[in-house]
C-alpha cells in the first residue's frame, strides 16, 4: 500500500513540477531539446552529482522523492538542481556528462558559479 501511494503522489507531483532556466524562465514540455546533462548538489554544497536524462523534470523529481533510499543521491541528500545544459542529441548529452565527470571540483564549481552564483535550486514545484 505504501509503495502504491508513493507512486501516486510522485505521479501527481510530477504533473505540477517545473524546471526553470537561470533567467527564471519555465523549461516546458514543448522544449525541442529533450536531453539534458545536469548537476545536483546538497544543501551544504559539499557533494556534487552529475547525470544525464531525456526528461529533466521527471529525473529531478525522482532524485527529490528519494524513491530508492540506497541511491547515492538519497544517501547524501543530493537533491538541488544547480546547473543543467540541454542537447538535441543523446550522444552529445552523454559526452558532456563524461567530460564534466572528469573535471576537478574547482572547475565544476566555476561552471555552476558562472550561471547560478547563488546555487539556487532550479527545480520548482508549481
PLM feature segments, named:
Residues 1-68, 74-84, 94-98, 115-117, ...:
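GIY-YIG nuclease catalytic motif and its immediate N-terminal context
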